[in-house]
């Protein structure tokens, strides 16, 4: 059994004295583990950096075996954003959330393409807004997507101001009424119209709610990866510095 594909390196852990087990995310194979012989060596360390894009060949005697990888570096991303702490935190968050969320060996070609785009845009203008859109796409792929097309209560499409924390559907200001304080605010950033970083943080609070209270329980109630909170903290510090 074998296949070859470009993949995004999500995680690396030591295996024995000299090898490593890596987790790759590819378009057609999904999240797929494999052993890299000699992966713990100094020679391989620059290749096996989380977020790197690798040309990988996987081989195993049987399809249900963990198998082994041979890899070549296509694009190393961590070194490119090493001087940008916020972008580096974004890289870590993307990889950690994918490893946390995706089942093994299930293909998500659309999410793979979107992930490549958001990683390639790290540090660019409006990348944080693109990251928010990526989290929304992840929720959709996992079956917990937001529906911001119309009010869940009345069907109107104007003056949508809130989101139901239970269903992820939009609610108009008029329909919310006295229940408004129990709903999540609909940040313009969730519709691609962020006015500034505060809107993006408000949007991430919404996606964070659904990641923590809907997705995580479906995966055995595991806590969200700490890397995501480190990104939120980094973005908040950036806002504070910008306003000082």
Swiss-Prot record:
GO terms for biological process: DNA recombination; double-strand break repair. GO terms for cellular component: bacterial nucleoid. InterPro entries: ARFGAP/RecO, DNA_rep/recomb_RecO_N, NA-bd_OB-fold, RecO, RecO_C. Keywords: DNA damage, DNA recombination, DNA repair. Pfam families: RecO_C, RecO_N. It comes from the Bacteria. PANTHER family: DNA REPAIR PROTEIN RECO (PTHR33991:SF1). Involved in DNA repair and RecF pathway recombination. Belongs to the RecO family. This is DNA repair protein RecO. It comes from Jannaschia sp. (strain CCS1). The gene is recO.
């Amino acid at each position: 059994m074998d296949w070859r594909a470009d993949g995004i390196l999500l995680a690396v852990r030591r295996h024995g004295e000299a090898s490593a087990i890596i987790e790759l995310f590819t378009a057609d194979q999904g999240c797929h583990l494999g052993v890299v012989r000699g992966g713990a060596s100094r020679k391989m360390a620059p290749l096996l950096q989380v977020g790197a894009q690798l040309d990988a060949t996987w081989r195993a005697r049987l399809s249900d075996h963990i198998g082994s990888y041979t890899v070549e570096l296509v694009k190393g991303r961590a070194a490119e954003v090493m001087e940008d702490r916020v972008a580096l935190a974004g890289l870590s968050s993307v990889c950690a959330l994918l490893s946390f969320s995706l089942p093994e060996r299930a293909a998500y070609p659309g999410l793979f393409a979107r992930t490549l785009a958001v990683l390639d845009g790290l540090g660019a203008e409006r990348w944080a807004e693109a990251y928010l859109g990526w989290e929304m796409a992840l929720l959709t792929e996992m079956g917990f997507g937001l529906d911001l097309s119309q009010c869940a209560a009345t069907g109107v499409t104007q003056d949508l101001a809130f989101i139901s924390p239970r269903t992820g559907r939009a609610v108009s200001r008029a329909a919310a009424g006295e229940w408004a304080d129990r709903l999540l605010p609909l940040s313009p950033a969730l519709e691609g119209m962020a006015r500034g970083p505060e809107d993006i943080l408000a949007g991430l609070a919404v996606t964070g709610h659904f990641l923590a209270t809907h997705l995580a329980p479906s995966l055995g109630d595991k806590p969200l990866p700490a890397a995501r909170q480190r990104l939120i903290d980094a973005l908040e510090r950036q806002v504070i510095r910008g306003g000082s």
